């Protein structure tokens, strides 16, 4: 029977997602169905190696463009709420909220240090040497991608043109909600996950003093946030008239406290109603589910009722994704970006492009069908029996938390043909799945109990990537009915802020739906167990090589 809510006239929510290379918006109804979608690329600068920058004004302009597009022709009175998610990039503004440069060139339009920027290596090393108590909530070791090292870098390198003039340091999701409402309140998600804030205790003065950023404590932490809200909480009195005009939305509609993009993906999938799909997690608590948000990089989101401390895995963060639950967040620094890197750098790439274009296929759809062609009688995964990849081309985020690790490939030959490219692509996809297995095993050893993967993000659209995750972890993989789960997650925030649902959990259960379940091929387990042994041995070998080269 349909509930009364489903029979009501449609209520709409807008979700805006700012990814690494584009801004996307969606119009979503109260059942979680995506009714309209728009995307707009955003600018990126790399003035020097490991420095990655964006422009908050360029990002906001793109938000306005895509939002206007998705609400075109819609009855404005039915739009009830707006939710934002974005990468955890750092936005720097002066006391009047104007952009400040985060670069030596003094270009103030480039006022965003991107999440994947690795300029603050020396700073994060010094922060980790303090062994401060806040570090136990980031798996024991802070990442160079978090905000404290980037802030320290700005103070040490751009004192006059940036640091001394700065009035506001925002995580990008919080910048967007401020832009929409004029409210400088921060989301608990960003502050807890990237800024060392504690949901129970607030900021820790001793940490900022110890690392040389005591000036942030001034004026009750006004530069980095002193009003903190749960994700999905309504901000101020809603959308300001100015922002409403720019976005093409009704003034005063509810705007939610934001989420980081991966957390929005987790919110969009982890609460789905799985009844009738033959999954073990059906009768189990939501804590048996692991959401894997896989795009440029991958994030592995597991929640628990009590805090679980996992070495090399971020968290436990209280209420950072689902209110009332502790979050642990594993991750891989490059996944989609690594697959692109391996494929595009191969001598056969131009041939692949030409053949895929001739067939009107994406290069990955073409590669998947090419692998089926060359596999002969064996399962496709067995093509990599002699080719093994260790995927940390950009360091290891989890579970080793070692920025110095490099990528490895063993089993190369003189072959440069399309078969060779396809098999290297397969080995790379498998390596990413083995990395997920490594994270899962580490989380389980620390106290998590996981049975099902919920995949979303760009790579979840690749059937080979999904099947390899099922086969290599031995767990079923659930894919959402809406492939754009991150946007559904952002819309869920807007729905919560509007008051149309009593809780985030209710909105998750109503608005996220199972589309497809991919089960593991258990017959191939022995083969993947062997490959996994090789995988773990590779990193040990890398450490041995380093020890030899760094020895006296």
Curated annotation (Swiss-Prot):
Catalytic activity entry: D-ribulose + ATP = D-ribulose 5-phosphate + ADP + H(+)
CDD domains: ASKHA_NBD_FGGY_D-RBK (cd07782)
InterPro entries per record: ATPase_NBD, Carb_kinase_FGGY, FGGY_C, FGGY_N, FGGY_RbtK-like
Pathway connected to this protein: Carbohydrate metabolism; pentose and glucuronate interconversion
Enzyme class: transferase
Pfam families in UniProt: FGGY_C, FGGY_N
GO molecular function: D-ribulokinase activity
GO biological process: neuron cellular homeostasis
Record-linked SUPFAM superfamilies: Actin-like ATPase domain (SSF53067)
Function, as annotated: Postulated to function in a metabolite repair mechanism by preventing toxic accumulation of free D-ribulose formed by non-specific phosphatase activities. Alternatively, may play a role in regulating D-ribulose 5-phosphate recycling in the pentose phosphate pathway. Can phosphorylate ribitol with low efficiency.
Entry similarity comment: Belongs to the FGGY kinase family.
This protein's name: FGGY carbohydrate kinase domain-containing protein
Organism for this UniProt entry: Mus musculus
Recorded name of the encoding gene: Fggy
């Amino acid at each position: 029977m349909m509930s009364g809510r489903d029979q009501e006239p449609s209520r709409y929510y807008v979700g805006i997602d700012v990814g690494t290379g584009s801004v996307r918006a969606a119009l979503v109804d109260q059942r979680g169905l995506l009714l309209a979608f728009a995307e707009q690329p955003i600018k990126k600068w790399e003035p020097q190696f490991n420095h990655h920058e964006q422009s908050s004004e360029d990002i906001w302009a793109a938000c306005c463009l895509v939002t206007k597009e998705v609400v075109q022709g819609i009855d404005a009175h039915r739009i009830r709420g707006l939710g934002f998610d974005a990468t955890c990039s750092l936005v720097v503004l002066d006391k009047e909220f104007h952009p400040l440069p985060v670069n030596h060139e003094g270009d103030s339009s480039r006022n965003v240090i991107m999440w994947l920027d690795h300029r603050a290596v020396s700073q994060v090393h010094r922060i980790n040497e303090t062994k401060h108590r806040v570090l136990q909530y980031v798996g024991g070791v802070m990442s160079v991608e978090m905000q404290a090292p980037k802030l320290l870098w700005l103070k040490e390198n751009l004192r006059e043109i940036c640091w001394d003039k700065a009035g506001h340091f925002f995580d990008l999701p919080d910048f967007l909600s401020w832009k929409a409402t004029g409210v400088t309140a921060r989301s608990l998600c960003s502050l807890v996950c990237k800024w060392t804030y504690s949901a129970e205790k607030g900021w820790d003065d001793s940490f900022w003093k110890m690392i040389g950023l005591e000036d942030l404590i001034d004026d009750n932490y006004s530069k980095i946030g002193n009003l903190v809200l749960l994700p999905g909480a309504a901000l101020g009195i809603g959308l300001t008239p100015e922002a409403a005009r720019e976005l093409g939305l009704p003034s005063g509609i509810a705007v939610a406290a934001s989420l980081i993009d991966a957390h929005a993906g987790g919110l969009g999938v982890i609460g789905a109603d799985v009844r009738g799909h033959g999954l073990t997690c059906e009768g189990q608590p939501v804590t048996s589910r692991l959401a894997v948000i896989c795009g440029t990089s991958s994030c592995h989101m597991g929640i628990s009722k009590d805090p679980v401390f996992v070495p090399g895995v971020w968290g436990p963060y209280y209420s950072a994704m689902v209110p009332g639950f502790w979050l642990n967040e594993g991750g891989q620094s490059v996944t989609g970006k690594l697959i692109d890197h391996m494929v595009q750098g191969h001598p056969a790439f131009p041939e692949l492009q030409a053949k895929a274009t001739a067939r009107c296929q994406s290069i990955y759809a073409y590669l998947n069908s090419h692998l089926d062609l060359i596999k002969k009688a064996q399962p496709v995964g067995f093509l990599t029996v002699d080719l093994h990849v260790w995927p940390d081309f950009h360091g290891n985020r989890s579970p080793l938390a070692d920025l110095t690790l490099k990528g490895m490939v063993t089993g190369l030959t003189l072959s440069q043909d399309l078969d060779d490219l396809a098999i290297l692509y397969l080995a790379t996809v498998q390596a990413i799945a083995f990395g997920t297995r490594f994270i899962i095993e580490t989380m389980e050893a620390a106290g998590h109990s996981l049975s099902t993967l919920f995949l979303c993000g760009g790579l979840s659209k690749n059937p080979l990537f999904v099947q390899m995750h099922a086969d290599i972890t031995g767990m079923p993989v659930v894919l959402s009915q809406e492939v754009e789960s991150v946007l559904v997650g952002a819309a869920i925030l807007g729905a919560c802020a509007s008051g149309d649902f009593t809780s985030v959990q209710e909105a998750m259960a109503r608005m996220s739906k199972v589309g497809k379940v991919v089960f593991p091929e258990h017959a191939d387990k022995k083969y993947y167990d062997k490959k996994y042994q090789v995988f773990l041995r590779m990193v040990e070998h890398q450490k041995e090589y380093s020890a030899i080269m760094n020895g006296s």
